[in-house]
Amino acid sequence: MAHKSIVIFSVLAVLCHSASVKVPPIVDSSLPVKFSEVIAEPAPNVPSNLASYAYALDIYVQTTLSQLQCIKQAGYCAVFVRAYNPAGQGSFDTSSCVTIQNAYKAGLGIEIYMTPQPVSNKQGYQQLDEIIQGLTARAITVRAIWIQVTSPTNWPNNANSNINFINSIVSRARQSGLTVGIYTSYYDWNQITTGWSNIGNDVLLWYWNVYSGGVTGETPANFNDFRKFGCWTAPSVKQFAQDETVCGITVNRDVYLAGNVLKAVEEDGKIYAGGFVQGSLKI
């Protein structure tokens, strides 16, 4: 009888412990691995006395018009919308169309980024083609593309293969008349490409630097911590915060040089998105 009591108490203890454990929400797998289990918390307010920098958000979930209007009212000037989902073999993210259309209606600047799938049976340029075709079919014309090159564990352990994959996307973007940017960090770029420096001086840089996910892991919202790597001597955008909530959605926060982003425009019934971040701060 004593043995049975011990077993019962043990089971109850396990159940009680399980019930008290907080399970973190699912966070997008394209985020840096070490921050993938951070529970998002509300972001601080955007400063009202900005001079050199403007604030933006990068978003990977479908976002409503009311949420984007809230984002605009909160002091953000632009959104970076993910248009390619790396899950499986990778695919065009159809939900990005709704977010882009709503961002246009909210009066926000719009940039498009892709999280490619480097181990897919599709070449890099084919993945970009999917984005262009998918957005064009919905009356959205792409003028620029940002390519996410982060999380080295998601890439093959072969720098030459990775360089060829990235170059495939960059070359196709140039052929399509698009401005090209890379979203990466000093560490990621060196791990994935061993510091490839021949990507081209026309390619813009959006770098990330955070201490950890959440508000306490933010770095200063400026470019002062930038150090040269690859071919880049200056950045265009910095992601300084990850896994925070703004207007009820989980986002990452960014800054860029004030005055470099305009609203998306509509001509001939089409929305033209991307190509608004153009300049860089020479350091």
Curated annotation (Swiss-Prot):
Domain of life of the organism encoding this protein: Eukaryota
Keyword check for Signal: yes
GO molecular function annotation: lysozyme activity
Disruption phenotype: Increased abl-1, fat-5, clec-60 and rga-6 mRNA levels. Reduced survival in response to fungus C.neoformans infection. Reduced survival in response to bacterium B.thuringiensis infection. Increased survival in response to bacterium S.typhimurium infection. Susceptibility to S.typhimurium infection is abolished in an abl-1 (ok171) mutant background. Compared to wild-type, mutants grown in presence of bacterium M.nematophilum are more constipated, the tail swelling is increased, growth is slower and they are arrested at the L3 larval stage.
Annotated tissue distribution: Expressed in intestine. Expressed in rectal gland cells and head neurons.
Signal peptide span: 1-18
UniProt keyword Signal present: yes
Keywords: Antimicrobial, Immunity, Innate immunity, Signal
GO biological process: cell wall macromolecule catabolic process; defense response to fungus; defense response to Gram-negative bacterium; defense response to Gram-positive bacterium; innate immune response; peptidoglycan catabolic process; signal transduction
Induction: Induced by Gram-negative bacterium S.marcescens infection. Induced by Gram-positive bacterium M.nematophilum infection. Transiently induced by Gram-negative bacteria S.boydii and S.flexneri. Down-regulated by exposure to Gram-positive bacterium B.thuringiensis spore toxins. Down-regulated by exposure to Gram-negative bacteria S.marcescens or P.aeruginosa infection. Down-regulated by Gram-positive bacterium S.aureus infection in the anterior part of the intestine.
Span of domain Ch-type lysozyme: 53-273
Stated role: Plays a role in resistance to Gram-positive bacteria B.thuringiensis and M.nematophilum and Gram-negative bacteria S.boydii or S.flexneri infection and to fungus C.neoformans infection. Plays a role in susceptibility to Gram-negative bacterium S.typhimurium infection.
PANTHER family associated with the record: GLYCOSIDE HYDROLASE FAMILY 25 PROTEIN-RELATED, LYSOZYME PROTEIN
Family that this chain belongs to: Belongs to the glycosyl hydrolase 25 family.
Protein name (record): Lysozyme-like protein 7
Taxonomic source organism: Caenorhabditis elegans
Gene: lys-7
